C-alpha cells in the first residue's frame, strides 16, 4: 500500500512541476524535527476547497476554527487542541495526530476510519496547507492555515496559486470568519486553568 502510494506520487511529480513553478509546493516532502518545530503553536483555519463531497459538507458548518499543535518528536505524534465554532457555539476537542515522516503526512482516526493529509508549506513561513487526496483528481483538495486569524492579500494569493495547480476554481473556496468565533472565552479559561496547575506543581 505504501509502495503504491509512493509510486503514484512520483508519477505526479512531472505533471505538477511542469505547471506553474509554485506547483512544487504540492509535492510532499519528508517531515523532520525542524518541520515539527515550525508547526508548533497556534494556527487559524482560514479557508479550504475540496472536490471530495464529504469534506465539503463537513467544512460548510464551520464558522471559525483555531488550534494548537504540540508535537512529540520521539513518538511521532502531535497533540491537537482544537477550538471550533459551529452554529454560533464553541466546540472543543483534543486528540492525537500520527506523523508519517517519510510520506510527509499526518493522520487522525475519526468516524471509524483514518483521515490522511499531506503537510505542505508555502513561501510565507507564517502559513501552511494540508493537502487531501493529492493522488486522486476527483477528490483532491487543500485547506489553508495561518498564525493569525486574518491573512494578507499575498498570503491568500499563494493559496490561490496552489488551487490553480490543482485546477480547483477559486469560486469553490469556503472561508471562515473570525468575527463569528465563540471559543476565545473558553480558550482563556483553559489557559487560566493550565497556569493554576503549573503553579500548584
Curated annotation (Swiss-Prot):
Q: Which residues carry this modification: Pyrrolidone carboxylic acid?
A: 19
Q: What does the PTM comment state?
A: N-glycosylated. N-glycan heterogeneity at Asn-33: Hex5HexNAc4 (minor), Hex6HexNAc5 (major) and dHex1Hex6HexNAc5 (minor).
Q: Give the residue range of the signal peptide.
A: 1-18
Q: Which InterPro entries match?
A: A1A_glycop (IPR001500), Calycin (IPR012674), Lipocln_cytosolic_FA-bd_dom (IPR000566)
Say yes or no: keyword Disulfide bond present: yes
Glycosylated position list: 33, 56, 72, 93, 103
Its GO CC terms are: azurophil granule lumen; blood microparticle; collagen-containing extracellular matrix; extracellular exosome; extracellular region; extracellular space; platelet alpha granule lumen; specific granule lumen
Indicate where this protein resides in the cell: Secreted
State the superkingdom: Eukaryota
Q: Which GO terms describe its biological process?
A: acute-phase response; positive regulation of interleukin-1 beta production; positive regulation of interleukin-1 production; positive regulation of tumor necrosis factor production; regulation of immune system process
One matching Pfam family is Lipocalin
Which keywords fit this entry according to its UniProt record?
Acute phase, Disulfide bond, Glycoprotein, Pyrrolidone carboxylic acid, Secreted, Signal, Transport
- Hey, what tissues is this thing expressed in? Expressed by the liver and secreted in plasma.
* Disulphide bridges, residue numbers: 23-165, 90-183
- Induction field: Synthesis is controlled by glucocorticoids, interleukin-1 and interleukin-6, It increases 5- to 50-fold upon inflammation.
Described by its record, this protein's role is as follows:
Functions as a transport protein in the blood stream. Binds various hydrophobic ligands in the interior of its beta-barrel domain. Also binds synthetic drugs and influences their distribution and availability. Appears to function in modulating the activity of the immune system during the acute-phase reaction.
Similarity-based family: Belongs to the calycin superfamily. Lipocalin family.
Which PANTHER family does the annotation name? ALPHA-1-ACID GLYCOPROTEIN, ALPHA-1-ACID GLYCOPROTEIN 2
Q: What is known of its domains?
A: Contains a beta-barrel that binds various ligands in its interior.
Question: Which protein is depicted?
Answer: Alpha-1-acid glycoprotein 2
Q: What's the name of its gene? A: ORM2
